[in-house]
């Protein structure tokens, strides 16, 4: 039997692990022989071409991994395949597992939905597809005019490794994902992870072998998909120490390992290891969601916010890793005033990225299934974002969308950090007000960087010293790109600039870009031949004009 396992990734750079997990399960547990191949695509590609790529293989079974980012395109692909190929189509993944009956009722071209851990369930399904389907745990299927669902089975073993030779051929330098644990110790009302199987950890020696395989595959980033990497302190420490001890040896330098952690439960032992990790070897993503503990309690999230802040400040002080923190707008009980406070606290931690997301009511989460306890309105199409709550109006959420856009363009891009520092620390404008007010005054979509910088100057120039603002924006532009165009409003041409440029060129610094800081009687110089920092920008240096004897 010819079987194709497929997944539409959000971008080419992302290589989904799920189809390879299914293929590994078939190799390990099937009682029969199957011709299995993995076919990947992207949601931005030509869906008709992708469907015909699968059709041309003439499979008997096509399986799709379904998520909120690909379900629409996956269903479109499945419909095309069914119209042109005599095959059975089975869907799996979190986007269909919690509404299996609904999927079969709505989409006649889908034959089966499979829930639970696919490494075991999928080979069992293939072995029984022409026999007794009632033996297949987690399967939902049609029988005459009735839809039957078989309960899932709970597993405790380590699943087989998905990292086959074929996996590495297709990885081709993309982001590599690794799963070392399954489940989550928390039961947050907006998340599926805690609803899955109880938290269990995979064999540690196998994990170490897989880390080396992925690190030497040519990828630049190895991303751990464990929902709370530091749920087990001893185990997390052992993995971090393994990476540290092998970095620059079996693990090539420049490979970065990404972990999702709970910041408030970080212990001193883990912090000590993290402080000694090689520069750039680690990225940490910390989901705060909110700093309002009443809000966190309402969504069943336990967080010691005081300890969380303390630990993030420690992590930032190490200066050797990229720190990414998350906030969610639309949570139960959080109004605009509360969100603004959470935002300003989050911003004050000066992480390299402050991601501002919007609550999504996924199938299967408590917040979707218990509308009385968690009242809100949301979009019924993926990704199911909240459109209003009793605490946040639809207009306020739209306003926050523009705030998010400005946050990404000004701060998360790393492009305007000096300007933001000036506006917040010297002028005294609150961080939230900067992004919210400016974001809602300008449509940054498809706007060139130089035009965006000009809009920024024009918006804030009457709220502060316009000369200092001009200098800060100019310095920021020099730090972020070697080819950026400087808007005319920021330019001042005089002989001093020419003298300074000549000075650096004659001293062998031909890659240096400079700005004259008239407000300080100094020169800001950026050597763009050097590597960018953790904020993805070049470092600038300050020189005294008198010291360089340019006058």
Predicted regions and their residues:
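A structural motif corresponding to the C-terminal lobe/cap of the Radical SAM core domain
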Residues: 8, 233, 246-251, 260-265, ...
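N-terminal [4Fe-4S]-dependent radical SAM core
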Residues: 1-2, 136, 140-180
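Proline-aspartate-enriched helix->loop->beta-strand connector
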Residues: 58-62, 219, 351-352
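Glycine-rich beta-alpha loop elements in corrinoid/cobalamin-binding modules
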Residues: 2, 25, 34-151
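Radical SAM [4Fe-4S] cluster-binding motif and immediate context
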Residues: 161-321
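A short, glycine/small-residue-rich beta-strand->loop->alpha-helix junction that serves as a flexible
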Residues: 9-18, 66-71
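Radical SAM enzyme core and accessory elements
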Residues: 1-8, 28-35, 47, 51, ...
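Hydrophobic/aromatic residues located in beta-strands of well-ordered beta-sheets
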Residues: 3, 36, 89, 136-137, ...
């Amino acid at each position: 039997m010819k079987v194709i396992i497929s997944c539409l990734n959000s971008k080419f750079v992302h290589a989904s692990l799920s189809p390879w997990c299914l293929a590994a399960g078939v190799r390990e547990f099937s009682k029969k022989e199957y011709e299995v191949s993995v076919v990947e695509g992207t949601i931005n590609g030509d869906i008709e071409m992708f469907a015909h790529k699968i059709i041309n293989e003439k499979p008997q079974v096509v399986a799709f991994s379904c998520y909120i980012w690909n379900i629409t395109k996956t269903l479109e692909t499945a419909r095309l395949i069914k119209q042109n190929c005599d095959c059975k189509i089975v869907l799996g993944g979190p986007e269909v597992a919690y509404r299996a009956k609904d999927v079969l009722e709505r989409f006649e071209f889908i034959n089966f939905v499979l829930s639970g851990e696919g490494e075991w369930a999928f080979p069992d399904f293939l072995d029984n597809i022409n026999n007794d389907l009632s033996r297949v745990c987690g399967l939902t299927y049609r029988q005459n005019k009735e839809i039957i669902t078989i309960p899932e089975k709970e597993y405790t073993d380590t699943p087989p490794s998905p990292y086959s030779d074929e996996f590495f051929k297709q990885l081709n330098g993309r982001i590599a994902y690794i799963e070392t644990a399954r489940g989550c110790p928390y039961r947050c009302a907006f998340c599926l992870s805690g609803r899955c199987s109880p938290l269990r950890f995979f064999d540690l020696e196998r994990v170490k072998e897989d880390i080396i395989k992925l690190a030497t595959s040519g990828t630049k980033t190895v991303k751990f998909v464990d929902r709370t990497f530091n749920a087990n302190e001893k185990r997390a420490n052992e993995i971090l120490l393994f990476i540290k001890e092998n970095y620059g040896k079996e693990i090539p330098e420049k490979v970065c390992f990404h972990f999702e952690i709970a910041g408030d439960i970080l212990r001193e032992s883990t912090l000590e290891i993290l402080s000694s990790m090689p520069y750039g070897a680690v990225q940490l993503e910390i989901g705060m969601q909110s700093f309002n503990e009443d809000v966190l309690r309402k969504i069943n999230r336990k967080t010691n916010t005081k300890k969380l802040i303390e630990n993030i400040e420690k992590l930032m002080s190490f200066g050797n890793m990229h720190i990414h923190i998350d906030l969610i707008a639309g949570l139960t009980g959080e109004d605009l005033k509360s969100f603004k406070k959470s935002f300003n606290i989050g911003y004050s931690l000066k992480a390299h990225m402050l991601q501002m997301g919007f609550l999504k009511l996924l199938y299967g989460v408590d917040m979707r299934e218990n509308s009385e306890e968690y009242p809100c309105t949301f979009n019924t199409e993926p990704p199911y974002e909240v459109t209003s709550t009793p605490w946040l109006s639809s207009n306020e959420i739209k306003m926050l969308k523009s705030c998010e856009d400005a946050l990404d363009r000004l701060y998360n891009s790393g492009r305007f950090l000096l300007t933001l520092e000036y506006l917040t620390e010297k002028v005294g404008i609150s961080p939230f007000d900067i992004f919210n007010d400016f974001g809602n005054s300008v449509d940054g979509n498809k706007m060139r960087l130089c035009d965006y910088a000009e809009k920024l100057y024009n918006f804030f120039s009457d709220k502060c010293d316009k000369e200092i603002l001009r200098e800060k924006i100019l310095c920021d532009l020099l730090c972020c790109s070697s080819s950026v165009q400087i808007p005319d409003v920021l330019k001042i041409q005089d002989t001093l600039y020419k003298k300074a440029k000549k000075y650096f060129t004659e001293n062998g610094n031909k890659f240096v870009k400079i700005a004259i800081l008239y407000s300080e009687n100094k020169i800001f110089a950026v050597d763009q031949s050097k590597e960018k920092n953790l904020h993805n920008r070049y470092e600038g240096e300050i020189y005294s004009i008198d010291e360089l004897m340019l006058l």
